[in-house]
Amino acid sequence: MKYDMNHRKNSDDTPPASRTVKEMMAEFQNKLDDGDNRFRKQPPPPPSPRRAPPPPPHRKPASLSPPPDDENTIRPPSSSESSENIPEEPQELITPNTTRRSLGPKPTVAPKPLFLNGLLPSSSTSDVSSQNSPKCDPHPSCTTPTILVSPATSEYSNGVFFGANETNGSGVKDRARQLVNMGFVPRMQNGGTGTPSERPISQVSTLSQVSDEFDEGDTSASDEESMNSEKHLRRHRHEDDFDELPLPKNERKTTTVAATHSEIMNEMEHLFVRGGKKNNGVHKQQRRQSNIDEIPSDVGKLRDNRKGRHNSLFVSPTSGMSSSSTDDFSRITSMTSDRSSILTSHSGGEDSTDGASPVPDYETGDEKDDQRLKKLHYAAVEFLKVQNNYVQYLKEMAVLYPEYMERFGKRVGRDLLASHNGHENVVLQIKKIMVQILPIHEMLLKEIDKVCSNWDSRYPNMSKTIGTFADFLKCCQPFLDNKADFLNKLLQLRNEDKEFDEATYMFETEVFKRGKKGAVIQQLDQVHQNFMRYKLLMLRYSEYLIDDCDEKEKAQEAIQKLENVTQAVNQKMGLPTTEELTKLYYRFQCQFNVLEPGRVLIRQSEVMKQTRKELQPRYLVLFTDYLWICRVSSSGQFDINRSYRIPLEYMKFERMEEDERIRCLQIRSRVKSALIIFSSEKERNQWTDDLTKAQYDRKSYKRRQSTAVQRHDENKKKMNKLLMLTPEVPDASDLERPQLIDSRSRSMSCESQDELSSVPVTPLDNGEIDETLGFGEVTRNGSGKKPPSEMIKPVWLPDNISNECLMEGCSTEFNIINRRHHCRDCGWLICKFCKGQAPLSKYDFTKQNVCSECFDRHYKAYKDGVLFPSKNMIVQSDETILVKIGKRNDKEIVDPRKLFKAPVNYGFRHRNVEEKRAQSIVFGRVYLSFRSRKTETVRHALLRRDDLKLVFYKAELDSKSVLELLIYGYFYRETPLDDGWLFELVHRNQIRTDDTKDDVISFRVDNSASAKKWSAAFADKLELDPTRG
């Protein structure tokens, strides 16, 4: 650095001789050595309006700053200047004969280069240009040439100080001593025997500090500049304060159960954070001290921000210990987890894999190959995600759940893990087996982590790890053999032990956040479903491998190993094989998780569905929680957009008992209603039995869940009465998780409780008086039970079931002009004259086609004020009422009167179609044939009871017959055929001639049950033909 002192005039006013910079610096140093302290640093400027940050516990504040000046150069003081403003400061005198002491301690953490005045070095010459200076101009008093200050060390080998062209070591040391005297570099206190002082925190320093607030130290900058620089200079927390981070604590005063839960979580927090990391604290301290001796090789050079050293002391926002993690699950999992950030963090981003390095683009020159390599990278990282989640689940069930139950029992004064019915507690039994499973999967997780940490899709090597551990997966067999017993014991214990059930409920809802409500019982299937996941992951992984490569062959071998293991386990358990589930998973186009915990495949088969015009093929899949009615595409996969997923608890099914529909099953639900036709009556009965059992189990689970919510609500109400000593209105900040969970549980229960479910729910009012409506009647508030006709979608009658309108009094026959219509409320077949329009609740109160009878019912409900829920009504200022209709995301406000359109045939009712069947001896579908015709015609025939007339109809529900025959005097013949039974009615004339022919009517019945009824009716009313030999 040059110090231009030529502008100073000497006291004798003689022009100074031309001297070099070295000579001027030597003269300046002699003055300092003689005790002239006028060039020492000035007192610090007045403090900034912003509060300075508190120093860390291990640091001592050093408020050294360069002296202000008016020029761009440093001038020696004149004799006229007063020395009163120069503070006397004891310091170490440095002479050429004295031994130079250490210039200060080495930094604890290697800092980035410190650039004075915010300027970057652009050259190594003495005069450095400022073309790379930041946008804000530096302070006028600090516009000296750029100086790059390295951390205080015992050697200064950089040639960028002062005269870069001077290479002698003594010159560099002299310049270093000048930096010490000027305050840019810390000095040793008390002659070097005391505690060393740290380098002062500069306004451009990026070292991590404890406080989140900081002081720039520059009072000349504007507030806007300060705010902009604050974003880039935010201090991070120091490692010493890592264990002191305040964890969120839910202070609840609502129930004893909630208070007990809070105490337990606080204890477990202390157990895992304070106690479990005592040894790690020593290691961290040693590692931090060891960093003192580590000086990176690139100190003094410009480093890329992306390649900067990662500060392990800083807790990233994606970590489990972030300040935003306020729930108990995040706290406990972050306490117990000792894995790396790649396992514990779950950051978003397309190119990010759970906190790991971004997935590279693999620029090979071929775009398709680049995409393949990138997908292969994602497939490899997916192994790590799945295995990490599974290991975490095992830890929660084997460690966290028993510990939680034990501590909860101590709070309530009894042992919740005591023996039950003379046997060891089921929680301890589960713990014993899962503790044996956990080490194997931790080893597998470690190996997968090792592979993923050095992953390169051009050299894949995941198959070897999976193939090696495939045989060890059999360690889960003992748990799978006893899983059904564990399930029954848990159910029994929760039903009998109220406190055990409450503790489990709190653990499920507050800590164990897996699946719906995080049910512990439902998650027991995780162990078995883990088998299936490995093969699915390997299949996806192998898809992106190049054919005829070694890794492809190893992947196929690993897949076969996994298949053998899962086949053996599934055969022993009597469950579907992995291959079957894998095929089903891909038929769902990977859009439905067949391996969801608690979800088991029960049955699947091809069926036929009766549509309004014809029979169409469908594929029926039954799980423990859903029934799928799938439309199969030409490729064999399911068309998800045109398939229906029906929850079992919201469904009704009914066997059709008519002879022609003995293979049919009618399914009705709020999602979809249909008539399913199976291949045989036996298959229909098997499906009905499985549906009945699956629905019962599902409702039982919902009932237990709702009962737990009710108990929690009752306890909360009781404790509120005891704790409400002073009337206080809780604000929004007091609404902690239990209240939110309870309200959500109640709403879910209320939505699932209708006429189809026997699950008990919290009592809710069915209506409320709303005087603003003007009707003076009780209106529904939208949360009570609704009639089945308002919730269940109807099964439409097929078009060929009738050739005429089915409304009583209407004689319209369907043809090209008069087309068929279906009522959306009851599924009835009507004509255009009997069709009206009305809003239906099952279609979100949108306007739909209805028959005359349904229109009358809904219009009467509208007049009575009970059709629309009060939450859907909007009262205008002029007392007119508007309603909200449509789906949740597509609401529309309309005038309710515009939603109704009366039919032409107003007031007509449904025809009694059962009357015809009730007045007959036998009724069914037949195939009528005449002697003059060789073809058969489908007809529906009945034998009338009162007059013994055989009547044939064109359609099943027609009222007009096409043929009537009085069967008195007829003989009958019956002949068994391969496709049914043939019945012939023969009438002979009393006068017979050679050309006389018998009058014969024949028809075939394809249903065996219907054929028996026809045979019995003819045998009772007619005589057998005697001519039949």
Swiss-Prot record:
Residue sites binding Zn(2+) 2 per the record: C823, C826, C851, C854
Residues in PH domain copies: 593-696
Ranges where the record places region Disordered: 1-155, 185-254, 279-370
Molecular function in Gene Ontology: guanyl-nucleotide exchange factor activity; zinc ion binding
UniProt function note: Activates cdc-42, a member of the Ras-like family of Rho- and Rac proteins, by exchanging bound GDP for free GTP. May play a role in regulating the actin cytoskeleton and cell shape. Required for normal lifespan.
UniProt GO cellular component terms: cytoplasm; cytoskeleton
Residues the record lists as binding Zn(2+) 1: C810, C831, C834
UniProt feature, compositional bias: Low complexity: 76-85, 122-133, 316-334
All residue ranges annotated as the DH domain in the record: 375-572
Biased composition (Polar residues): 141-155, 200-211, 335-347
Skewed-composition ranges (Pro residues): 42-56
Mutant phenotype after disruption: RNAi-mediated knockdown reduces lifespan.
Acidic residues compositional bias, start-end: 212-227
Keywords associated with the record: Cytoplasm, Cytoskeleton, Guanine-nucleotide releasing factor, Metal-binding, Repeat, Zinc, Zinc-finger
Presence of the UniProt keyword Metal-binding in the record: yes
InterPro entries: DBL_dom_sf (IPR035899), DH_dom (IPR000219), FYVE_RhoGEF_PH (IPR051092), PH-like_dom_sf (IPR011993), PH_domain (IPR001849), Znf_FYVE (IPR000306), Znf_FYVE-rel (IPR017455), Znf_FYVE_PHD (IPR011011)
Repeat is among the record's keywords: yes
Subcellular location: Cytoplasm, Cytoskeleton
Source organism (scientific name): Caenorhabditis elegans
Protein name per UniProt: FYVE, RhoGEF and PH domain-containing protein tag-77
Zinc finger FYVE-type: from-to: 810-859
SUPFAM superfamilies in the record: DBL homology domain (DH-domain) (SSF48065), FYVE/PHD zinc finger (SSF57903), PH domain-like (SSF50729)
Basic and acidic residues bias locations: 1-12, 20-39
BP-aspect Gene Ontology terms: cytoskeleton organization; filopodium assembly
